[in-house]
């Protein structure tokens, strides 16, 4: 009976272990790529190709973009305006990463642990440069067998929560006018 229980337990545990190894491998690969992009001094800062590729490959762009605005705003706009918003948000995110690169992120990203809650991986890591350490959490989901970042939390400050608050304020000030938000994002 014990053997059957152990075999059954191992059978259930094996997929979880494989998933842990897969997300760990993804994180190590993408965090290394992130640091390489950030520390590449040969990259022309006006050329967003590397940043754009990284963002497209690793961020759940549509989910984040739509999550940052009220559902009524989404429902109140046509597809053309929503697509324009998605494109403006993508460029805004790329420029945000470019600005981060200009602050010269260096060191190593160290994986501390990974938790899974409600199908969202919460990856706890630190960026260490020898002198200091910055706490960095990544919220990641699996979409169509690809891992996608839905939020980055730096020193307990969520990018998603911060931007949602900013976008809500802009939309409220402009009576829910998504075109005005797009205009502001494009000026960034």
Tell me the role of every PLM-derived stretch.
Residues 4-13:
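Sec-dependent N-terminal signal peptides
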Residues 16-20:
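Boundary at the C-terminal end of the N-terminal hydrophobic targeting segment
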Residues 95-134, 184, 188:
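Surface-exposed, charged secondary-structure patches
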Residues 154-188:
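Low-complexity, intrinsically disordered terminal/linker segments enriched in charged
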Residues 36, 43-46, 80, 106, ...:
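Surface-exposed, polar/charged faces of alpha-helical domains
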Residues 21-100:
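Early exported N-terminus immediately downstream of N-terminal targeting peptides
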Residues 133-161:
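Short beta-strand edge/turn micro-motifs at domain boundaries
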